[in-house]
């Protein structure tokens, strides 16, 4: 199965109070985004689509991505859904699509492979976690209605 991996890296990270975008902040000896790229590059039959904003040249100069990486410019930062929408023309038909944040370096290859293996056909798999204090985090509101 082909896997299209969308990595969202267009945010400016204003709250970081740094000259570097949030995805370029270091963790260990490399930028947050590089950790995500390195993990995703281990997925077979995958193609990376990295959505970047106004600092695209800076981001591309900081990280090492596979040659086949599709760098997608989000001209106006209009949210997560809009960022994903920018990649739609480049996604392969019938591929499994995985969306990740470029500032989320702790996702493990084992977790991604398990998520991908559970996604088939028209099904949707969503990887979330329960936070003890969700303040300041994006929320997933899930309502399951019985048929």
Predicted regions and their residues:
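N-terminal nucleotide-binding beta1-loop-alpha1 segment
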Residues: 1-18
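Short beta-strand segments
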Residues: 8-9, 51, 99-101, 126-130
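Short, proline-centered helix/strand-breaking motifs
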Residues: 18, 104-105, 118
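Short glycine-enriched, charge-decorated loop/helix-capping segments at active-site entrances
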Residues: 20-26
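Conserved N-terminal catalytic core of the sugar/cofactor nucleotidyltransferase
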Residues: 30-102, 106-114
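Conserved donor-nucleotide/metal-binding helix-loop-beta segment in metal-dependent transferases, i.e.
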Residues: 110-135
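Residue-level detector of conserved catalytic or cofactor/ligand-binding positions
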Residues: 139-147
